[in-house]
Amino acid sequence: MLRVGENLNVMVKKIGTAMKDRDPKPIQELAIAEAKAGVDFIDINLGPARKGGGELMEWVVKTVQEVVDTPLYLDTINAEAIEAGLKVYKKKKGNAVINSIMARPESMDLKFPIAAKYNAGVVALLWGPSGLPRDADERGVLAAELMQKCLEFGIPGEDVWMDPIVTPVTSPQSQVQVPSCIEFMKMFKDLQEILPGMRSTCGLSNVSNGAPEHLRPILNQTYMMMLERFGMASAIVDAFDEDLKKFASGGRPELRKLVYRVMDGEEIDPKSVSKEEADYVKTTRVLIAKALYSDSWLEL
């Protein structure tokens, strides 16, 4: 699974201050560190960037590309800022990617022409006019709308990254939303027949938002394995999470097989396996809604 480094984010105090002060050093140091950590893309997250977003994105893109060749995700709702970044982006190892275009007319009409103009990739986000889709079927409907727009604007499948939207396991809707993301991925191969070459991505760490910090890694790792089983090609992640990096590169196959067995409905007694394996069994059951989430799920 490809990794998109999420760390260059305006919400990180040090980075936000550096952006505000136009101080290149912290930004370049972080970009170099992400590249050394082996990420396949670096996400530049400016947030809303309503005031001066165009000038800021142009400066950050130039600043980052002075020191690394890693392709960039341009992450903001400000279309003007995205275009400003694309104007100065230098294609070294791949196209820049617009993160993201929602399945809403105002987003599609504004950003698809920009993507086509600059030969940029797009994250096609399954967020529709009514907000978050309720289930896998609604995700499929929104995906079809976004794919149609890609075809209209000549965006090749290889430049399209479908994001089904990962939601927190701690949310009230988790028993529907967390499994429905998996269900959507089961139909993804059929969608790829409509737009060959299209791949998928997600904000993986969203699944553990709201969980105690020490429990977030196992949620992220387990959900990564579950999504990857059905073709999830990439994820926006912490570039410096070494354990997650191992899972993304296919490490720990014995845990992967165990997770798949639980997904397939096998009842595995946690007492019959090691403590580590039992934790992954329990976590998988929570993520497929066979057990309720609580902060003490590993202790039950």
Model-derived segments and spans:
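Catalytic alpha/beta core domains of metabolic enzymes, predominantly
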Residues: 117-269
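Glycine-rich, proline-tolerant flexible connector loops at the mouths of alpha/beta enzymes
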Residues: 35-73, 166-174, 178
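Alpha-helix-loop-beta-strand connector modules within alpha/beta enzyme cores
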Residues: 52-93, 180-198
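Active-site mouth loops of central-metabolism enzymes
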Residues: 3-29, 53, 99-105, 131-136, ...
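Catalytic beta/alpha-barrel core
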Residues: 43-49, 70-78, 95-105, 126
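Extended, intrinsically disordered, low-complexity segments
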Residues: 1-17, 28-29, 240-241, 246-300
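Acidic (Asp/Glu)-rich catalytic clusters
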Residues: 35-36, 65-66, 86-93, 109-121, ...
